[in-house]
């Protein structure tokens, strides 16, 4: 699978810059084949030494050093720990951004592979393992290989290619900026002015050798919910003397689930709503004054997202009021819908079919996972 995506990113870049002949296509395929061993070696190195979001210090430096060795214009650090390489051919043509995310996750790796991660870190005040459990090690290695090949054929290219190695895709630590939004804020799409952006994501759920895609909304928007329910504290022996926020919270949780199942037109766009944490109380025999809940909302359409926000607030507040309590609802907008330009999708499909085979370039349904490549595709046509 890694070879397929590596070749695709390479071919996307070159196809936008010049119309390839069969001979040029064969040359790119051969260069990708020759680069494969190096890409695997890089991937295993990054897998063995993962770093958490906004803490990718060694990762970012290794990437920047590689880009410098290729003779590229390098900006580092960007967005705290990221790196940007710019290949200017000196000839008129489009400016193409190729993006890879570089952060790992607070996950303990449990296998006996020789390149398994044994890294540790502190996350939310706890000692945790660190693992590239989402494939970003592969993304880094692929883009490093693509950069090396394109730098080697610079004289045959036109336009400009911007290599974006982005930190903190998994989310910056609380209280910090990070990720694609911070890269954009720091101007990575402006100097040089990017015309189109490409990203990729490997998946263990996709058969090896297959590439999947979808025009328009591909991945969901992801928002965070915080609901604070306030009641009246009382002793468990006399619940009538207070207002039980735990019971109110239970009713709110059930009520929220009816929004998706009973109120939305699911033939238009889907949504998922999950309450994932609930905290309240200090003793087994005391009804608490307050309960806090958090959760996540996933939507596949911007209009649906706005409507869900309105209904969540209305449902929680009205249920609480009907039971003598209050509910404070905060919805924190996260990553927007990852939108694939229909025009770029139409252009890319025959390229994917050539590289993977027509039967293995598969249009799929939207996925409710989220990706902050969506911020790039909000600013420029993306795929």
Predicted features, each with a name:
Residues 46, 85, 98, 136, ...:
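Divalent metal-coordination and catalytic microenvironments
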Residues 35-39, 43, 47-50, 70-71, ...:
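Sec/Tat-exported extracytoplasmic proteins
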Residues 33-37, 50-61, 133, 137, ...:
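Soluble non-cytosolic domains of exported or imported proteins
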Residues 20, 69, 250-383:
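Metal-dependent amide/peptide-bond hydrolase catalytic core
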Residues 1-23:
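Bacterial Sec-dependent N-terminal signal peptides
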Residues 120-131, 137-138, 149-150, 155-277, ...:
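Histidine/acidic-residue-rich, glycine-tolerant segments that coordinate divalent metal ions
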Residues 20-131, 141-158:
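Acidic/His- and Gly-rich active-site-bordering loop/insert found
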């Amino acid at each position: 699978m890694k070879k397929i995506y590596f070749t695709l990113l390479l071919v996307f870049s070159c196809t936008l810059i010049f119309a390839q002949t069969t001979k040029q296509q064969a040359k790119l395929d051969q260069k990708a084949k020759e680069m494969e061993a190096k890409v695997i070696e890089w991937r295993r190195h990054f897998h063995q030494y993962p770093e958490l979001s906004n803490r990718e210090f060694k990762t970012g430096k290794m990437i920047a050093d590689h880009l410098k060795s290729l003779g590229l214009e390098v900006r580092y650090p960007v967005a705290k720990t990221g790196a940007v390489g710019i290949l200017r051919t000196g000839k008129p043509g489009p400016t193409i951004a190729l993006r890879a995310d570089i952060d790992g996750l607070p996950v303990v790796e449990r296998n006996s592979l020789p390149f398994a991660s044994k890294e540790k870190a502190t996350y939310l005040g706890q000692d945790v393992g660190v693992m590239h459990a989402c494939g970003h090690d592969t993304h880094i290695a692929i883009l490093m290989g693509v950069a090396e090949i394109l730098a080697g054929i610079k004289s045959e290219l036109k336009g400009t290619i911007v290599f974006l190695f982005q930190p903190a895709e998994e989310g910056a630590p609380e209280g910090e900026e990070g990720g694609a939004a911070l890269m954009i804020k720091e101007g990575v799409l402006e100097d040089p002015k990017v015309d189109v952006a490409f990203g990729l994501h490997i998946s263990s759920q996709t058969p090896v050798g297959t590439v999947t895609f979808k025009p328009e909304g591909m991945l969901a928007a992801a928002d965070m919910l915080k609901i604070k329910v306030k009641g009246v504290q009382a002793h468990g022996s006399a619940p009538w003397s207070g207002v039980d926020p735990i019971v109110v919270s239970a009713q709110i949780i059930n009520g929220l689930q009816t929004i998706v199942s009973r109120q939305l037109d699911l033939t238009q766009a889907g949504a998922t709503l999950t309450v994932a944490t609930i905290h309240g109380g200090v003793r087994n025999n005391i009804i608490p004054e307050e309960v806090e809940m958090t959760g996540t909302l996933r939507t596949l359409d911007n209009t649906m997202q706005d409507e869900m926000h309105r209904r969540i607030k209305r449902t929680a507040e009205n249920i609480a009021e009907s039971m003598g309590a209050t509910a404070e609802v905060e919805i924190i907008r996260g990553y927007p819908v990852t939108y694939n330009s229909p025009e770029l999708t139409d252009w890319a499909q025959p390229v994917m079919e050539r590289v993977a085979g027509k039967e293995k370039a598969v249009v799929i349904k939207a996925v409710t996972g989220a990706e902050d490549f969506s911020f790039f595709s909000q600013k420029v046509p993306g795929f």
